[in-house]
A protein has these predicted regions:
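Flavin-dependent oxidoreductase catalytic cores
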Residues: 1-175
Length: 175
């Protein structure tokens, strides 16, 4: 099937990454990409085992992640970027993100990077410095996962404070 083929391609790409010397793998599960499309009730209108309930919507991303994890060397670090909220009624919310992060942890995910949005046409995103840090904090508080915060974090002093305040374990700084 197409889904099985895509899963195999992810496994193959992950193994190539290890072979050429990558230090870790992060699966992109947000911003409207494939796994986000499965996870989001805004985009997933399937009526099979991959649609409907949160359990079903998580199924394919978890299957692919588990297949990658199983193929990698035993302690090779692998994480996933997840959506903390879609900023849209009826979309992924913090509670679903917590459940998904806990399910990832059960299958050996080493960390999650908590982002947001990406699937709604007109989300009401309160964009400002550090606007997604509270999402990382929510995931950190409700899971045992290592959590990375993102979102307009450009000041190294603030980045350090996020870690000191235990809002996240890691901080991504870019742009």
């Amino acid at each position: 099937s197409d889904l099985e083929n895509i899963k195999n391609k992810f496994v193959e790409a992950s193994l190539r990454s290890v072979r050429i010397g990558f230090d870790l793998i992060e699966i992109h599960g947000t911003h409207g990409y494939l796994f986000h499309q499965f996870l989001s009730p805004l985009s997933n209108h399937r009526s099979d085992k991959y649609g409907g309930s949160l359990e079903n919507r998580m199924r394919y991303p978890l299957e692919v992640f588990a297949s990658i994890k199983q193929a990698l060397p035993k302690d090779f670090p692998i994480g996933m970027r997840i959506t903390g909220t879609e900023w849209e009624k009826g979309g992924i919310d913090e509670q679903e993100a917590i459940i998904f992060a806990n399910e990832l942890e059960k299958i050996g995910c080493h960390y999650v990077c908590v982002s947001s949005g990406g699937n709604a046409p007109n989300p009401k995103i309160p964009i400002a410095p550090h606007y997604q840090v509270h999402l990382a904090k929510i995931i950190k508080k409700n899971t045992d996962m290592v959590v990375r915060a993102v979102g307009m974090i450009t000041d190294p002093i603030k980045a350090n404070q996020i870690i000191v305040d235990k809002e996240a374990d890691m901080v991504a700084i870019a742009r």
